[in-house]
Amino acid sequence: MVVALLAVVALSKGEGGVIMQHCKLACEAPIAAGYRLEKWYPKERAVLLASTALFGNNFGQTWSPSGFYGGSDASGFTYGGSAGFYNELRVTVSAQRAAIGVPVVKGSGWRSVSGGWPPNCRPGQNNLDGQGAWGGGSCLCAGAIVLPVRDEGPLILDGGPSRDTVPDPPKPLKGPFEWLKMIFDPRQRRFTAEEIVSRLAQRSGGRKRFEMFREPGALKRWDTSVTVPKIEQYAKLPAGDGPTAKPNISVGGMALCAMKQMVKKVGPDSD
C-alpha cells in the first residue's frame, strides 16, 4: 500500500512536484499562535494533535484531475487537499479559545512565507481566526503548527523560526520520498504516536524540545498501533465521510484518519 501511494504521488507530477518539493517541508516557517492546547488536551494529546498537523502540512495534497478547496496547477495536482482537516482544527481551536476565554486575534495561527507554494502564498494568509476557512485559494505552505507548552515557551515542532521571521531556504532533500520513508516504514508495517514524536524530533534537530513529552508512561494510554491495513480501510471511506471532499487518494488524509482514531480512544475530557 505504501509503495502504491508513493507511486501515485510520483506519477501525479514527477519527482519535482511531490509535496515536499512544493512546500519545502511545510516552508519551515511555523508561527507561534498564542493559544495553549494543553488546556484542552493533556500534553501527550497535544503532541499527537501537533504531529497530525505536521502530517497534514507535509502530506495533505490530493492527486485529483480537478481542483477543490483551492485549485490545481496545470498538471491537475491539487494544492488545497485535506482542507477538511484544517477546518476541523480551526473549529477545535476556536471552541477551545472560547472555553478558556482567550480572545480570537486576527492573524494568529499558521502563516505562510512570501514566495511559498502556491506562488500566491503571502504572510498572514490562512489564519485560524475564523476569518477565512482553508477553502478558496488555500495555501498548503503554511508551516507546522506551534504549540505553546505550559510556561516554557512555544514548542516549534518543525524546528523553524519564531514569530514573523522568514527562514533561509531549506536544504534540498536527498530524495523525493525521504520524509515519507522516515515516517512510513514498510518493513515495520506500522507506526506509533511515540515513534512519530521521536522521528519528528530527529528530523527537526529538536530532541530537547521533546523531552517534556518523554517521561515514562506518557503515551501508554494511547492505542498507538496503526497498521497499514487499517490505513487502507480509511482510504476506502466514501465521499463526505473521509479525509477529502471527494473519494480521491490522499496520503495526508489517511494519516489523519488514523491519528483521529487514536484521539477518539481517549477523548478530550479524559485525564
UniProtKB/Swiss-Prot annotation:
Keywords: Signal. Residues 1-16 form the signal peptide. Has antitumor activity. This is Leaf protein. It comes from Cynodon dactylon.
